[in-house]
Structure formats: structure tokens, C-alpha cells
Amino acid sequence: MKKVLFSLIFLIFLIVACGETTGEKPVNKGLAGFAVEFAEDFDLGSPEHRIENPEGGIVTTINITALGYDKKPLTDYSGEVEIGMLYGENSAVSRITMQNGYAGNIEVKMRYCLDNDRVVVQEVKKHEGEETYEPTGKIGVSPVFYTEVATISAIQGTVKGAKGAPSAFNNRNLTLKDKEMVVIAVIEGGFYLHEVGAEDYSSVYMYTYSTPYVDDNKEESMSLPVGTLIESANGSVFEFFGFTEMSFPTFHPVYVNKNGKKELKIDTSLIPAPKDVGDILTDNDEMEKHEASLVTVKNVSVAWFNEEDSSYIEYSQFPLETSDGKSIMAQTLYTAPLFNAVAEKPEEGKTPHHYNFTGILKQHTSARPSTWILVPRDMDDIECLDCK
């Protein structure tokens, strides 16, 4: 009997010792996260008053404090942390060692920041016998700061130098606004948007998957007209084989009031004249400046191609050749289907036709012999110079 009683008392002691009868929750100890503060003189900006975003990045300093679960400084903490950005990139020192729960006056150089961003600090550790650092899940973020809003020229003109010159804002969701923008072409699957007044990197493809429609005070929606002014557009920046696009966008046209009804504001005079790219076809850096823009190549003829090749069978892509031997691909299947590229192939004893080809400049890094592709808007963009 004494043994049973002793066992019962011992069991009760264990239960009490484990806290199961007290209603108390286990107490978390150690590092919970970090407080990240900017230098006192750093201007966070606001949605109404945005700070400048210089080409070399926004340079300032931060202070990092380790915090416990009680949200108080954890002065006995030592460890390694990495300093990055929520969206952009920190090009200053990215990994430091914290001692006594604090690291102060740490320089950050914040690049590729648009609209708003934050500095992110996370703890990292190396597993025994390994060289790579892994995050532990303990993080901290700075207050939000507001930089210049996204523009087409910023998205297209800020690149990271890899094949196809991808945008530095790849995979970011951004809103284009505060610039005058006009629709320069509507092609099945999307439309091309131009930033009025921008000379280079001025246009981008808005991939809508299907023909873009708008509601212009009519009973049924209508296809987005060329020349429509766009007030703002939101979408995710995506690199499709080197071609920068904004995927599945929402967009807001500019409307005007006419006789008590709202109508789309259309101004085709804002569509820029096509850029002659004949002299820069082999200069990828220069061609990048005109991606998704209206361009033209003059006095070209259809070069020989294998009509059984998948690039022609599946995508109707064929090469054009200039008088000095430069190449650019063309695609006419959807927009100018009456152009018979096969009939224009060079043959022995046959005099080739010469054309001025105008259209939208696309890029596909697997296309050959050129990764650049010219897509006419319609048959009017193909001018034969010597057809009878």
C-alpha cells in the first residue's frame, strides 16, 4: 500500500514539476528577432514625397539590436547575421558578426529599389563541416522607406548584365504610374505600352494572355484601341527567354467626359516614329534600348531558311537579311498572315524582293540566326520596294 501511495505522490510531483496542472505556458528563451533602425538623419520619405534613387544606390547606416521574446534587448547574444533587402539589393557588406546583442553604424547600399522597400536582417548559421550559411528563421525588418515610383524606362533600363539583359526587377510586382503612357500596338495575347518622352528603354510588353479589353461606356467591352492613354498599370515583371514583360496586368485607361459620357482618351500622335535599327542589329546593348518598341529595318530580303524547322512550323519565324549581311528574325503569322515567307526564299536564278519591315522588336534567346524578332503590326508595316 505504501508503495502505491509513494508512486502516486511521485506521479503528482512530476505533473506539477512539468507545469501541467498550473495552466502556465512554456516560456520561450533566447533570440526572437532583431530591431533594425536607420540612422537618425535618414529620410524615409512618404507616398506623397519620395526620396531620390541615385544610380549607385541609396547609402546610409543602420543599427541592429537583438531582441528576446519579451521584446527587450538580448545583451548576451552573439551570432552572425546577413543584411539584405525585402525587394532590392544591398551591395555593401552583407554578413556581419554581432557581439553583446548589438551592431551599430553598419553601412548599407540599397540598390534596385522602386516604390517602397525595407532592409531585412536575418540570423544565419553554418552546419558543422559545411561552408554554406543557412537562415535560422530569426529576422528583423527596418521601417518602410519610399523611393521613386516604377516607370517603364526604369524597369527596362535597369539590368543585371546576364544573357538577354534581364531586368533588375524580375519577379517583382510593380505599378507603373506618374508618367504619360500610350498603347503603341495590340497583338493577340497582350499590348505594348510606351512611356511618352523616353528615348531609350521606353516600351514594355503587357502580357494579358488574351486580347485586352476595356469598358468604354458601351453595353459590351471592346478591344483596347491603339493610341489609348494609360493612367496606371500593375503587373509582375517577368523575363521570358530574355524578353521583359509585365504579366497578367491590371490597367486603368485615361477617360475624358464627352456629352456627359466617359470615353477613352486616344491620341495616336503620341505614338513615336519607328527607330531604324539597321546599323545596330549586331550590337545587343544598343538593341536592348529598343526592346518592345517600334522599329524598322530597310532594304531587307528574306534569307534562306528551313521551312521544316520548328521555329517556322510552330512560330512562323524566318530570317531577314540586310544588304550588308546582318540578320534579324521576323514573325508574321498572327499579324500579317498574307506575307508568304516561303515564296520569298532565295532561289537560283530568282531575283529577290526587297522590303522595308516595320514592327515591334521582341527578343527570344533561343532564336537563330538572331535572337531579335521583328513583329509587324499588320500588312501595312511591310513595304515592298521592287514588287510589280
Question: How should each PLM-predicted stretch be described?
Answer:
Residues F6-I9:
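Sec-dependent N-terminal signal peptides
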Residues L14-A17:
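C-terminal motif of bacterial Sec signal peptides marking the signal peptidase cleavage site
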Residues E24-V27, A35-P54, E134-K388:
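OB-fold nucleic-acid-binding modules
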Residues G19-E148:
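Core sequence-specific DNA-binding domains of diverse transcription factors
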Residues M1-V4, G19:
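Positively charged n-region of N-terminal signal peptides that target proteins for export
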Residues K3-V4, H127, N171, I266:
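N-terminal cationic leader/targeting segments used for protein routing and processing
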